[in-house]
């Protein structure tokens, strides 16, 4: 039990801990609550019973003083019991027909989320980015409902943003697409597959090159048992990938003027890792990355052709997989599968390759062991050296 006033007139007890940040004194907040008379435990109000979140601005004289003091101390997702005397509630007069005079009150309040009210276009974009980052942090903590709330608030800042400079409009467009995809990821986690399809489709309406959107729609259809639609979207994603590779070729031909522009030293992953991802089945090690732009162009063309050739294969084509069960066991086992099944698996696997996880950790300044994220076969190879 925490005393929030020197006289003990307001106390707070955490029933369920929250995550992330706390609201600023003038933020808008959204809460769910149940309100009781302390002496009789009689419920006199409830947003949950109405199935409607209660939204208000802190320090705007819309709620009792006990809430003004307690809610800024709460984290998103926190459920707290707030008890107050009448001095911090409805005072000597009470609340007509509902709260008696000089009544002590008890509330169970859950902080759903909070946000600022922007003024300019640039501020709306800044706050949308801020909400996106907040949602990302909550998503990593597996607080999916809270992350979804943050993403939605971020989207609200910019979804109707039109009266601004062209640069701001483009920045807002890219940001809302990113937020839509994150909302789709939340819906997948929550098994709201129809919502995931809808929101990712809206992302594609703004940017049809977002391969991740096709994969997430495909994943949602797969979870719904609609394998035909799932693989259709995976195929569209592959066609989009071919188009993006064509843009890379155009960049090499018309923008880069020497090889030095093409080379970039990465602190995140070795070049051999990138090459291995591009040619995963070959399993050669320590392959040097290409540093000649014309040779790179030829490599990209080969990748395009590989995708195009595979796109022509019937999804029902049977396949026999030869694989080891354990990295230390060289015996090959055979499994029956189909081209469509393996295409879907590879597509989903590609968007969360270990290198991405490792890159995120490093970008966040997290200490990552050298063996973090390495495949079992790679660890076995290192041990043999």
Curated annotation (Swiss-Prot):
Extract the Gene3D superfamilies matched here: 3.10.50.40, Tetratricopeptide repeat domain
SMART domains on file: TPR
**Keywords, in A-Z order:** Isomerase, Repeat, Rotamase, TPR repeat
- Could you say which EC number(s) this protein's record lists? 5.2.1.8
Look up keyword rRNA processing and say if it applies.
Answer: no
Record comment: activity regulation: Inhibited by both FK506 and rapamycin.
- Limits of the PPIase FKBP-type domain: 26-115
**What reaction gets catalysed by this protein?**
[protein]-peptidylproline (omega=180) = [protein]-peptidylproline (omega=0)
Q: Where are the TPR repeats?
A: 128-161, 177-210, 211-244
UniProt cross-references to SUPFAM superfamilies, sorted A to Z: FKBP-like (SSF54534), TPR-like (SSF48452)
Molecular function as annotated in GO: peptidyl-prolyl cis-trans isomerase activity
Does this entry carry the keyword Lyase?
A: no
**InterPro entries in the cross-refs:** FKBP4/5/8-like, PPIase_dom_sf, PPIase_FKBP_dom, TPR-like_helical_dom_sf, TPR_rpt
Protein function: PPIases accelerate the folding of proteins. It catalyzes the cis-trans isomerization of proline imidic peptide bonds in oligopeptides.
**Name assigned to this protein:** FK506-binding protein 5
Question: Which gene name does the record give?
Answer: FKBP5
